[in-house]
């Protein structure tokens, strides 16, 4: 018995962005998964909204610079209203070296100065809300840019420091540590580990410029709760969580070399994969839900979670993110 299901559909495309209708799978398989029987007091508006995705750098240039910007989105708000959409979803607009289209974030609480300012962002939020349009932003919690101040501090501080504990650093193998800690390849190709000047290696499951956070570090938890509150305080209505099935990792085990992680063919259904879809990740999202619920109305969220279908419902529980993309 399935209930409350809406699959991800690309309803239309145009030169500015794309409209996504019903982006969520709002709890599945009630009989197979008893925990899915939990019900929130009200269904999230995100569950069946028409949502228009915007890549800010190519949407609308308000200055003639040749680059789209936040003010350009505000200028197009009447157009967006005429489409009949209910929300806009902004791809990353944060300061970034743009190694991965903005998903390498150098500052989680600011606007890339090439795109405008926080004042421009506030104006855009106000223009959207006066038209009844909600605003969703991307959050990238699995990794940062290597230009983030935290990672620069980690490199400067050295092995065993609190600064380095925010990321996944390990000693190498071999007589002189010259071999990476595991044999993994990254999702975008090449080794998943890069060696730094003092001989340690750091993990990056995407590009070398995107070091993975260590979510066993309490400081990382506190930081992202603050990030969510920062944007919620500015009026953001919802969050799309990038690589939501990542974050929690277990590198203290003896079988790491057997996992062919880049091929994506080693997903398991019991939450014990060393890197992806671990059971511990749900503790993070329950923590985030407490942040969302401090607001009236509560902030909404949706997980980008590439997981086995039978585990999608875990991310969509009302005491966690509430929705998840359905990639099947």
Tell me what each language-model feature is.
Residues 9-16:
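N-terminal polybasic/positive-inside topogenic patches
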Residues 19-34:
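Short, Lys/Arg-enriched N-terminal segments with co-localized hydrophobic residues
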Residues 36-229, 233, 246-309:
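Acidic/aromatic-lined carbohydrate-recognition and catalytic surfaces
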Residues 88, 239-241:
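Hydrophobic residues within beta-strands of alpha/beta enzymes
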Residues 234-238:
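A glycine-centered loop/beta-turn motif at secondary-structure junctions
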Residues 305-328:
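Noncatalytic carbohydrate-binding groove/subsite architecture in carbohydrate-active enzymes
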